[in-house]
């Protein structure tokens, strides 16, 4: 949005105000000005001159000698190579000492590149030249914005241009233009009237809005045209008027200048008037050739499946059912609503009657269509931010008035107006004290009311209680904090004293759920795992690749209506799909080892489609592959195995104070049935872990052994023991023994440890499996398992004899289970 200060000055009294100071104040008060542009910057001393005569240069065929009247006593002589000059033409002249811009640069603010060129008098092939005549480009003017002027050679000005006047007085080159950086919530400021109201409120200046009236003539529009809304949720208001006896031509210079200040190219008086009203009032309009609209009827509806339209740019567009269109009486799309008109109903030089549209469309719908079609415009941008329905009638009457004043059209009697649900003014109730407390000042109520009324709020006050009616054009306000912000910014943020916020310091604490999650995370990180964060979405196709059988509860996933990607159409019911994608990505990047985990919510609906909020709970899952050891350390190259993952899970339970759990074979389908386990307590599975099933690895294209785990947090919550265990530092030394056992292959480690602990007595302090072997040197049907046993007494030093007795007792107990010492 650009704001011409010349134009703004016709709406609000800003005479004598410094443009730079004004821009700074607007920015501080929440209406940010990105750049202050001076279109004529770089042009100095360039005046208009009339060519009196043109002669050929005696020594150069490509040069011409021109005598010009520049408003001085004597004509001046300028030598030029331009071939388009003739006697009687008015041209811009840069005489000696004048400055012209170095170049035009569309990427620079205002299109002007820094630096200029100073003109000096001189000689061309022996003939004196007092300066130069200028082309459009040499004045730094964007040729695209001046379609009526010649773009080649010297700029030829209109015949009625006075002689000897500064070029700044033409085409508003003496204007100052603000390039605004408005936030999307301030949709009201995307118009000159909105900016005038805001400027008047901030600077306490009088605002004079245009007086709008229409001189209606001829037969009424009813019965000759109609407008309809098929879905009121997507079109809040639809106004229509009929212009007759239209004369297509150029717009007045002042309208063209104001359009150019916003970078809009003048086209013809009808299109220019529509663009002008959009800039002035903020309501986009669309014009149709009345005689080309079938049935003279316009209907706002959603596009049909497979429907197409040729837009004004000549491109055929494929529409989809989410796009809004304006259809004619034959139900054919005549316009992509709020985005671009149709080619078949375009206003041309032959147009005699124009059907006007002033409508308010759904912001989200216009945004989707605009992005999908790649069509962004001033109109679609305004619709995306929100349009006030009350401005529709004002805008359509304004364009009629402008064209009537130009003698370019007459307006048929009456206005078509479909307005299904009229907008009601928003009322906010609050108090002076609440607003003051929110801002942190003590403003008198009279001053507060004055500020609100300057912003066009209607205020009723009684004993400090305020009933505030929000103006219809402020769509961004909804409650007391918004009112407080309005008061604060107009009062001036710089006037609010800086204070240090006060608050009582209270001891913070985590909830039990937070504490459990923190402890699990801390334990996993301490064991060398890295936390990852994936999307809360998944694709149910990945569940099959994880070996989950059809009918498993993880398939009961909530579909997402508007997924961010086709790869994530469902809410996740397990963390494993996201982790598997992370793991495969790491493998593709040649990362040969990784230990990762994720914590997060999963979503389990009771039924689909949803009738109530789904069950949402926390899980932990992780995956490990490669070597846990860093290069240069002992055991370098050792790969993760089942006992690593088991130890990690045991450490988690230890961190939570959970004891007396059982270990069972896992039935979790993701894991290898023979190399996996569950920790179970009170009939609840606390965690499942093990090596990933070979079928899973094959489906994901992984050729390494991968170990994983799933921790069911809800099952743990009521088992966490907050008791802090304390044991004294031992006074007496321990005695250690190693047992190398020949164990039947069907025996589990858990069964062996249970026998040893029962036989070992109360002085057996620790028991640790440190070696497991099956191979050629071990009897068939058996495996070798080696344990380290630590014995200690609290009241004395144990003798070797005592320890040997317990070892004999343990060996006898093991023998009953066919477990013997290795020879």
Model region roles, listed by residue range:
Residues 125-134, 138-140, 149-154, 168, ...:
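Mobile "lid/hinge" segments at catalytic clefts and subdomain interfaces of large enzymes
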Residues 48-78, 257, 268, 274-346:
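Conserved mixed alpha/beta core segments that line enzyme active sites in large multi-domain catalysts
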Residues 2, 450-457, 467, 543, ...:
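A carboxyl-terminal module marker
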Residues 203-229, 407-435, 442:
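Terminal amphipathic helices with adjacent charged low-complexity linkers/tails
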Residues 3-9, 174-183, 236-244, 378-385, ...:
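Short, hydrophobic beta-strand segments
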Residues 1-216, 355, 372-374, 378, ...:
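Phosphate-backbone binding interfaces of nucleic-acid-interacting proteins
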Residues 428-594, 737, 790-792, 802-823:
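Extended, well-folded interaction surfaces typified by the phenylalanyl-tRNA synthetase beta subunit core
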Residues 5, 11, 24, 64, ...:
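Glycine/proline-enriched, intrinsically flexible loops and inter-domain linkers
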């Amino acid at each position: 949005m650009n704001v011409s200060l010349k134009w703004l000055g016709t709406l609000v009294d800003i005479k004598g105000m410094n443009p730079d100071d004004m821009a700074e104040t607007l920015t501080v008060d929440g209406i940010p000005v990105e750049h202050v542009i001076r279109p004529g910057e770089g042009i100095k001393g360039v005046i208009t001159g009339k060519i009196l005569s043109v002669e050929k240069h005696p020594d150069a065929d490509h040069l011409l000698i021109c005598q010009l009247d520049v408003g001085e006593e004597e004509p001046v002589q300028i030598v030029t190579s331009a071939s388009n000059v003739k006697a009687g033409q008015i041209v811009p002249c840069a005489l000696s000492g004048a400055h012209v811009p170095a170049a035009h640069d569309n990427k620079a603010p205002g299109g002007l590149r820094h630096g200029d060129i100073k003109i000096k008098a001189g000689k061309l092939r022996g003939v004196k030249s007092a300066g130069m005549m200028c082309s459009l480009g040499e004045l730094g003017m964007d040729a695209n914005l001046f379609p009526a002027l010649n773009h080649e050679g010297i700029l030829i000005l209109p015949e009625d241009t006075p002689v000897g006047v500064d070029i700044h007085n033409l085409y508003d080159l003496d204007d100052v233009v603000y390039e605004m950086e408005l936030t999307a919530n301030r949709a009201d400021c995307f118009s000159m009237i909105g900016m005038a109201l805001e400027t008047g409120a901030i600077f306490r200046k009088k605002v004079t809005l245009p007086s709008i009236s229409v001189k209606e003539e001829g037969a009424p529009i009813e019965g000759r045209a109609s407008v309809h809304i098929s879905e009121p949720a997507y079109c809040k208001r639809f106004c229509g008027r009929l212009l007759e006896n239209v004369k297509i031509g150029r717009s007045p210079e002042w309208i063209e200048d104001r359009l150019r200040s916003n970078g809009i190219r003048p086209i013809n008086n009808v299109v220019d008037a529509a663009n002008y009203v959009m800039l002035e009032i903020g309501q986009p309009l669309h014009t149709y050739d009345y005689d080309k609209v079938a049935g003279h009827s316009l209907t706002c509806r959603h596009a049909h499946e497979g429907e197409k339209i040729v837009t004004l740019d000549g491109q055929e567009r494929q529409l989809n059912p989410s796009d809004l269109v304006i259809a004619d009486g034959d139900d054919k799309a005549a316009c992509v609503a709020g985005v671009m008109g149709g080619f078949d109903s375009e206003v041309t030089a032959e147009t005699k009657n124009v059907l006007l549209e002033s409508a308010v469309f759904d912001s989200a719908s216009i945004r989707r269509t605009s992005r999908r079609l790649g069509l962004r415009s001033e109109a679609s941008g305004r619709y995306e931010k929100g349009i006030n329905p009350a401005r529709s009638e004002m805008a359509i009457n304004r364009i009629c008035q402008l064209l009537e004043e130009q003698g370019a059209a007459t307006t048929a009697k009456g206005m078509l107006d479909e307005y299904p649900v009229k907008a009601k003014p928003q009322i906010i109730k609050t108090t002076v004290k609440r607003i003051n407390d929110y801002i942190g000042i003590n403003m008198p109520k009279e001053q507060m009311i004055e500020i609100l009324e300057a912003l066009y709020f209607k205020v009723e006050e009684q004993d400090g209680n305020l009933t505030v009616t929000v103006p219809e054009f402020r769509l961004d306000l909804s409650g007391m904090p918004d009112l407080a912000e309005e008061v604060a910014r107009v009062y001036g943020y710089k006037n609010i004293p800086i204070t240090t916020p006060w608050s009582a310091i209270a001891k913070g604490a985590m909830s039990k759920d937070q504490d459990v999650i923190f402890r699990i995370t801390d334990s996993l990180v301490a064991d060398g795992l890295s936390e990852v964060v994936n999307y809360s979405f998944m694709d149910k196709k990945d569940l099959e690749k994880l070996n989950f059988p059809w009918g498993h509860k993880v398939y009961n996933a909530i579909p997402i209506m508007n997924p961010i990607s086709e790869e994530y159409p469902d809410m996740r019911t397990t963390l494993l799909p996201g982790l598997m994608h992370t793991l495969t990505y790491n493998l593709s990047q040649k990362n040969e080892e990784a230990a990762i985990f994720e914590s997060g919510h999963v979503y389990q609906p009771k039924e689909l489609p949803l009738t109530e909020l789904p069950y949402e709970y926390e899980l932990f899952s992780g995956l490990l592959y490669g070597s846990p050891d860093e290069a240069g350390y002992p055991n370098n190259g050792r790969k993760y195995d089942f006992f690593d993952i088991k130890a990690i899970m045991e450490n988690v339970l230890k961190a939570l104070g959970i004891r007396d759990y059982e270990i069972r074979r896992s039935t979790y389908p993701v894991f290898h049935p023979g190399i996996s386990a569950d920790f179970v307590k009170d009939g609840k599975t606390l965690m499942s872990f093990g090596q990933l099933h070979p079928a899973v690895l094959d489906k994901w294209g992984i050729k390494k052994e991968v170990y994983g785990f799933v921790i069911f947090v809800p099952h743990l919550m009521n088992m966490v023991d907050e008791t802090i265990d304390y044991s004294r530092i031992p006074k007496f030394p321990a005695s250690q023994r190693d047992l190398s056992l020949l164990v039947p292959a069907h025996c589990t480690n858990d069964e062996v440890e249970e026998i040893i602990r029962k036989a070992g007595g109360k002085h057996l302090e620790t028991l640790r499996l440190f070696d497991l072997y099956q191979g050629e040197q071990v009897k068939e049907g058996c495996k070798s398992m080696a344990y380290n046993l630590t014995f200690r007494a609290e009241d004395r030093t144990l003798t070797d004899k005592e320890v040997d007795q317990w070892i004999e007792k343990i060996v006898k107990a093991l023998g009953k289970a066919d477990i013997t010492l290795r020879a």
